[in-house]
C-alpha cells in the first residue's frame, strides 16, 4: 500500500516516536554483535546482509517466549493451568497474524510448515481439489521456486506472464497488460493467479490488489506470496474495495524477524469448506471410534493436526506485535530512505551492476538489493 506521511502535529509526533523505536530496535537483534574474522586478519562484529534469505531475531520477542515457556504444556487441553495458558497463547499468536495483515473475521490464519513453501504447496493442493474444472494457474517470471513449482505439480497448465522492461532494458514488475490478456484468454478455466508481493531477488513490488481485481473479474482467485514483502511494508489484505481483497496470503515467519517460527496461510475460510483436512491426526477431531471419525469444523484447528511448534508460533506473535507498535508505515519510510541512499552510493562504483530496473514507474522497490561486480565471482564479492 502507498505510504502517506502523517499531517497533524499529533500524528507527526507519534511518527517521530516510532522512528526512535526503530533506532532502538537496531541494537536488539540476536547475534548482531557476534565477532567474525576479517580478510585483514582482525576480527569484528558481523555485518548481516542476508535478510532477504532469513532475518535475525528480536531479543524482546525472545524474552516473551522465554517467559511463556515457563508454563509449557501441549495445547488443545484445559485440564491444567499450563495447558490452558499455552492454548490461549497459541490462539493469540494466530490473532497477531490476522491483525498484522488486516484480515477480517471471514479469514483464518493457519500455521503450516516452516515457511511459505509449505503454505503454497498446501493451497495448490486445496484449490486444485476444490475447483477441478479450473485447471489453469497464471504466475509470473519473477517468482521464487516456492511460488512456481507447486502449481506446476498440482495444476494441468501454468502460464508464466512476462515482466515490464524499462528503456534501459532492465526488468521491472509484472507486465499488467500481458497479465490481463492471459486472464481473459483462460477465463473460466483459470483457478487462481499466484504472484509475489515483492521479488526476493530485486525487491521490486507488484500491484497485488490490482491483480486480485483482475482475477476476480473472471471468477478466479488471487494467491499472494508475501514472504519477502511482509517485513518491509504494511499489508492490508482487504484492499480498498471488496474486489481488491486477496483470497490467500502466505507468510514466512523466519523472514519477519522470527527464525524458527512456522509458515502461515491467511485465507478465506470458505476455501477449506466441504473437504477433508489436508493432514489428519490429533487435535482436529470431535469424535473417533473404530469405524469413523468426525473432524471439527473449527478453523484453524481442522487444518493444524498434531502438536504445534509452540515456541515458534509464540515468537512470531510477539514479533508481529512489536512491529505493529512501531508501525509498518514507519518501517517502510525508514527503509525507503536507506534503500535510496544505498542504491545511489552503489551506482557510483565502476563495474557494479544492480539487478532490476531503477525506474520507479516500473520498479517500486522494497529494501532488497542484488548486485555484482564485473568479472568477479559472486562469492568473492560477498
What are these language model-derived features?
Residues 1-382:
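Pyridoxal 5′-phosphate
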Amino acid at each position: 500500500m502507498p505510504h502517506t506521511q502523517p499531517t497533524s502535529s499529533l500524528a507527526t509526533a507519534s511518527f517521530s516516536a516510532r522512528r526512535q523505536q526503530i533506532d532502538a530496535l537496531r541494537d536488539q537483534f540476536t547475534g548482531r554483535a557476534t565477532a567474525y574474522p576479517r580478510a585483514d586478519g582482525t576480527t569484528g562484529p558481523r555485518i548481516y546482509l542476508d535478510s532477504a534469505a532469513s532475518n535475525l531475531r528480536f531479543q524482546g520477542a525472545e524474552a516473551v517466549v522465554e517467559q511463556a515457556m515457563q508454563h509449557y504444556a501441549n495445547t488443545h487441553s484445559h485440564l491444567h493451568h499450563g495447558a490452558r495458558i499455552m492454548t490461549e497463547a497459541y490462539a493469540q499468536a494466530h490473532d497477531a497474524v490476522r491483525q498484522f495483515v488486516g484480515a477480517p473475521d471471514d479469514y483464518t490464519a493457519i500455521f503450516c510448515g516452516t515457511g511459505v513453501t509449505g503454505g503454497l504447496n498446501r493451497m495448490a493442493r486445496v484449490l486444485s481439489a476444490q475447483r477441478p474444472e479450473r485447471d489453469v494457474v497464471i504466475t509470473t517470471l519473477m517468482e521464487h521456486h516456492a511460488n512456481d513449482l507447486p502449481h506446476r505439480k498440482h495444476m494441468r497448465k501454468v502460464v508464466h506472464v512476462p515482466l515490464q522492461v524499462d528503456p534501459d532494458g532492465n526488468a521491472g514488475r509484472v507486465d499488467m497488460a500481458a497479465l490481463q490478456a492471459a486472464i481473459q484468454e483462460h477465463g473460466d478455466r483459470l483457478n487462481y493467479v499466484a504472484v509475489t508481493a515483492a521479488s526476493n531477488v530485486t525487491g521490486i513490488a507488484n500491484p497485488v490488489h490490482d491483480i486480485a481485481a483482475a482475477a476476480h473479474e473472471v471468477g478466479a482467485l488471487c494467491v499472494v506470496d508475501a514472504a519477502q514483502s511482509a517485513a518491509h511494508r504494511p499489508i492490508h489484505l482487504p484492499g480498498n474495495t471488496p474486489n481488491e481483497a486477496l483470497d490467500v496470503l502466505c507468510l514466512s515467519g523466519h523472514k519477519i524477524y522470527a527464525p524458527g517460527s512456522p509458515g502461515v496461510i491467511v485465507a478465506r475460510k470458505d476455501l477449506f469448506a466441504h473437504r477433508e483436512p489436508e493432514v489428519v491426526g490429533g487435535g482436529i477431531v470431535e469424535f473417533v471410534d473404530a469405524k469413523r471419525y468426525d473432524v471439527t469444523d473449527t478453523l484453524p484447528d481442522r487444518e493444524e493436526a498434531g502438536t504445534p511448534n509452540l515456541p515458534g508460533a509464540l515468537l512470531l506473535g510477539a514479533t508481529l506485535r512489536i512491529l505493529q507498535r512501531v508501525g509498518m508505515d514507519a518501517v517502510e519510510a525508514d527503509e525507503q530512505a536507506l534503500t535510496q541512499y544505498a542504491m545511489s552510493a552503489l551506482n557510483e562504483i565502476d563495474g557494479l551492476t544492480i539487478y532490476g530496473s531503477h525506474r520507479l514507474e516500473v520498479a517500486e522497490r522494497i529494501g532488497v538489493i542484488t548486485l555484482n561486480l564485473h568479472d568477479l565471482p559472486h562469492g568473492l564479492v560477498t
